[in-house]
Amino acid sequence: MTTNLQEKLTREARPMASNDSITFYRDFQKFYQASKTFFFTNPLVGRCKRDVLAYLHEDQDHCIQHAKQVAIDAGTLMLVEGRGWDPAQMRQWSLLAQIAGLLHDIHAPQSDHARTGAHVARTIIASYPLEEEEQEAIVFAVRHHEKPLSTTQTPCVCHWVSNALHDADKFHWSLDWMPTPLGETRPETRPWADQNTCCKVPADMETIRAMASTFRTRTGQQYGPQFINAGLATGEHLHQRPNDHILP
């Protein structure tokens, strides 16, 4: 795809997948800013960022920017869902959610990356100054960030962290493979619409559309469909373009 066409598609698609079309960040601005500040200032989060660099690369489908945004949004969801609970506890659980967000795709794009990534995550955080239960919550969240989760006999902190990670990840499934930056954190360098991508768009869109009913948290159930719809609007726009306008 030529640079001029990339720029044109970006201009066309930006209004469809902009922050303005997703009210989550506006409605929970205080919590989002708190999570974002925490992400950039907390020493343990900083340590985790350095630890995962060997596993996350800009040219992968699940890249550094995806991990970053999922981590911040998982922390935000934890703070939003925990309103009315002990603030100190929820800040700590927000930390766990952010670490899980950074780690969740360290073995992507392997088909079994959630399970294998959980094993690697356990090794990475083994020396972190966290309680055993907290480390288990991170590993549990990484292992279960893709599929439906049974709530039977699972420690509370595991569910809180796992649900926040799951929903934050799904927020961005429909956006991170589209050619439009969401705020300052969407990657701009990924190949956008090569031949393989064009062939996959309809099936991918159906898969993503089905995700609207799979969010686990109350906040995710309310706001998740906005993310889904923003990504779908962009995908449908690209799919409707003549192939000779999209392909190099």
Please annotate each region the language model reported.
Residues 48-55, 99-100:
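Short glycine/proline-rich turn/loop motifs
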Residues 1-38, 56-91, 103, 130, ...:
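Divalent metal-dependent phosphate-bond-processing catalytic cores, especially two-metal-ion Mg2+/Mn2+ enzymes
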Residues 70, 90-117, 138-147:
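His-Asp-centered metal-binding catalytic motifs of divalent-metal-dependent phosphohydrolases/nucleases
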Residues 131, 135-139:
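Membrane-interface starts of transmembrane alpha-helices
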Residues 42-50, 94:
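Active-site-adjacent bridging/hinge elements
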